[in-house]
Swiss-Prot record:
It holds the Pfam family Ribosomal_S4. The gene is rps4. Part of the 30S ribosomal subunit. Contacts protein S5. The interaction surface between S4 and S5 is involved in control of translational fidelity. This is Small ribosomal subunit protein uS4c. HAMAP family: Ribosomal_uS4_B. It comes from Elymus canadensis (Canada wild rye). SUPFAM superfamilies: Alpha-L RNA-binding motif.
Length: 196
């Protein structure tokens, strides 16, 4: 199954706010959610929605998400927290959280087009797993800096998570440590995703 490229507002109406997918918001008063009242389907539907929220927010395919759940399951700590840490330490998500891109798909495009350096080396894999003390910069040409400049200027420094720092003048971000659960940018119950 390939990455979702369809209408984003449909997904937001169905699943709720997904800041990584788009900045758009549905019109208030649009009541398109249908309520189903059955026992087993209700529980299944809740778990499926939580999984879909995670998938669409981070821009993952079904196979990628299963691989991350498998890796998190092998860890000795809580599977749900490890899963969220793995997803939050992806390069495309870190660019989004630093404010260098407006959405995670936009950050993926920056990485794919070779505008981003990690520790002085070009990385063109959006799923690259960042580690603490990684330095993320743009290429030293005007085009790359111009792409990131508008997003950094419009981003809110108060929303920056504690595990990241950014130098807006040099277009440089630093990963300080691994993310805490309370700084995840998405309201989700990760245990339901693992149970699914």
């Amino acid at each position: 199954m390939s990455r979702y490229r369809g209408p984003r507002l449909k997904k937001i109406r169905r699943l709720g706010a997904l800041p990584g997918l788009t900045r758009k918001t549905p019109k208030s008063g649009s009541n398109l959610k249908k309520k189903f009242n059955s026992g087993k389907k209700e529980q299944y539907r809740i778990r499926l929605q939580e999984k879909q929220k995670l998938r669409f927010h981070y821009g993952l395919t079904e196979r990628q998400l299963l691989r991350y759940v498998h890796i998190a399951g092998k860890a000795k700590r809580s599977t749900g927290q490890v899963l969220l840490q793995l997803l939050e330490m992806r390069l495309d998500n870190i660019l989004f959280r630093l404010g260098m891109a407006s959405t995670i798909p936009g950050a993926r495009q920056l990485v794919n087009h070779r505008h981003i350096l990690v520790n002085g080396r070009i990385v063109n894999i959006p799923s690259f797993r960042c580690k603490p003390r990684d330095i993320i910069t743009t290429k030293d040409n005007q085009r790359s800096k111009g792409l990131v400049q508008n997003y950094i200027a419009s981003s809110d420094p108060g929303k920056l998570p504690k595990h990241l720092t950014i130098d807006t003048l040099e277009y440089k971000g630093l990963v300080n440590k691994i993310l805490d659960r309370k700084w995840v940018g998405l309201k989700i119950n990760e245990l339901l995703v693992v149970e699914y």
